[in-house]
């Protein structure tokens, strides 16, 4: 009997020990699970991103795919930036959004910039997005428009009154001693080749990518006057308010580095960019067309100067000639000293991209 009691006591003690061990394991497991659910200390959390909003000249379209793919590629996040985008209807619109405080950086054209400076706005150019002039004026062959003088008395479409298409139309008109008073300017919107094809305008001011899309959509034989043959200056810059330039240089340096990263990616991986444009660009349904647009825009992103000094490098002499020309043409009234409104000190270290292969 005594041995039986002893055995029962031993069994009871073993069961208690086993149960205690099980409780310890369960408690340890619960603690581990709790640790996974509780946030890590603040030092281990992701760093806070700085918000930078870009005021665009357009809606989110294929040719700016490198600005649209942040969710997939994270170029700006990698530089500590939370990127925002405010769409516009022309470079002048982008500057208005910048000056009203809705954005930190404007994606705008030289004509709109010169006009704003002419009105006394305090602005600073910090990056040359497209060092090639991509603007043109296109007409159907039936109109017999071959040179700027032939535009007199014609109806000419522009994207908007605040766009680079209008500014560059003024440049072409000035070549023949004409002004907007000698033509009828018609606002057509971004799809400015439809009115041309339908006979609503005699010619339309556009860009290389716009002409490409027009041809894809059935545009027949046309005559093209390229503005670069008369004034070959950059098509678009990044511009900031002077106060922003003075107060946020380190942030702007990171922004430009991130943009340069994105531009380099689009140059080196146009096929990937074309596929992602389907997801992010409002006009990006056709991958093949996307690729053609992206290749054109890649070509306009590089120049002999960027071959030497990296993407974004600004040609001071060319820009001064452009500003002087706009004054000579009567588009602006004041002298603009480019060295006072253009700075290259925020550009990233040299990253040369010698060509954008087709």
Predicted regions and their residues:
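Pocket-lining segment of extracytoplasmic ligand-binding domains
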Residues: 111, 191-286
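Secondary-structure end/capping motifs
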Residues: 248-331
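Conserved C-terminal helix/tail region of periplasmic/extracytoplasmic solute-binding proteins
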Residues: 319-358
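Bacterial N-terminal signal peptides
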Residues: 29-39
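N-terminal secretory signal peptides that target proteins for export/translocation
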Residues: 1-22
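Sec/Tat signal peptide C-region and signal peptidase I cleavage site
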Residues: 40-44
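Short, glycine-/small- and polar/acidic-enriched structural segments
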Residues: 45-198, 202-208, 219, 224-225, ...
